[in-house]
Regions:
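NAD(P)+-binding Rossmann beta1-loop-alpha1 motif at the extreme N-terminus of oxidoreductases
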Residues: 1-52, 56-59, 129, 191-193
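Rossmann-like NAD(P)(H) cofactor-binding subdomain of soluble oxidoreductases
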Residues: 37, 46, 54-134
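Internal alpha-helical scaffold of NAD(P)-dependent oxidoreductase catalytic cores
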Residues: 102, 106-115, 131-167, 178-217, ...
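Small-residue helix-packing motif on alpha-helices
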Residues: 30, 40, 57, 73, ...
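Short acidic capping loops at alpha-helix termini that bridge into adjacent secondary structure
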Residues: 26-29, 87-89, 198
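NAD(P)-dependent Rossmann-like dehydrogenase/reductase catalytic/cofactor-binding core
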Residues: 205-260
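Short, well-ordered alpha-helices that flank and scaffold nucleotide-derived cofactor binding pockets
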Residues: 13, 17-21, 45, 78, ...
Length: 260
């Protein structure tokens, strides 16, 4: 299987590296494109193929991933449309801000529309720790499975109906920034408590990693794990209550709703 990722920015570049690292698809079967050679320099160490020409890059691709900013999508589609083979090639979009109707309209060729699937990873795909959503539009279930298989080994993959794609984006793709903002805030608190900044970041990062590992290992609800730490009258419950008084849970929920 040959994959071409159009766009070597934060998400497209991270996906190319993560897929290569996962090892299911050889790096030599992955091509990533960009407008400038300097953007592509970092991919050589992974054995990923690079190109400055979107048209040439899609010719031999089985799956074409559109990973550019939404306002660049029409331009990219106009470039690759003449070369698309709708009977063979699948399109995967990383741009939920461009509707399926618009995207298929940009790509329609001689009355034919390609198999289209949307996929939303997050930037942790680069280190194979993404939460990636896959949602078919015109693709068959078998084609959707094929797209999902591309992301095997890059973290967790979940197939969802299209109506859940934007909420999923808020929860996981935007959500990684929210998680990092918590780490930043807790680290700043750690500095106030007397730790050097680099040590505080290390402590908080490992604590968050440990919390996630507990949920995965036990299959429990977060509150069950919280209960194991909150002894009556103890420090933890006092800290949690102080956070709630400051609006912690509501702030997180409002942030997720705001990013939807």
């Amino acid at each position: 299987m040959n994959i071409t990722i159009i766009g070597a920015g934060n998400m497209g570049g991270a996906a190319a590296i993560g897929i290569a690292r996962a090892g299911k698809i050889p790096a030599s079967c992955i091509t990533v494109t960009a407008r400038h050679a300097t953007t592509l320099a970092r991919f050589s160490e992974y054995g990923i193929r690079t190109s400055l020409d979107n048209v040439e890059a899609v010719k031999d691709a089985d799956i074409v991933v559109i990973a550019v900013k939404p306002w660049i999508v029409p331009e990219v589609c106009s470039q690759i449309r003449p070369l698309l083979d709708c009977s063979r090639q699948q399109i995967v979009s990383f741009a939920p801000g461009v509707s399926p109707e618009d995207l298929l309209g940009f790509l329609e060729k001689d009355g034919q529309k390609p198999a289209l699937t949307y996929s939303i990873p997050n930037t942790a795909i680069e280190v194979c720790q993404s939460m990636t959503f896959v949602s078919r539009v015109t693709a068959t279930p078998e084609q959707e499975d094929e797209v999902a298989s591309v992301f095997e080994g890059t973290g967790s993959v979940m197939k969802v109906p299209f109506k859940q794609l934007m909420p999923g984006t808020a929860l996981a793709s935007c959500g990684i920034a929210y998680a990092l903002r918590y780490i930043r805030a807790a680290s700043e608190g750690g500095v106030e408590l007397g730790f050097y900044a680099r040590d505080a970041v290390k402590i908080v990062s490992q604590t968050v990693k440990g919390a996630a590992a507990l949920l995965e290992a036990h299959g429990t609800h977060p509150e069950q794990e919280i209960d194991k730490v909150t002894t009556p009258g103890g420090l933890t419950i006092r800290g949690l209550n102080a956070m709630e008084k400051a609006g912690f849970t509501n702030a997180v929920i409002q942030g997720l709703k705001g990013g939807k």
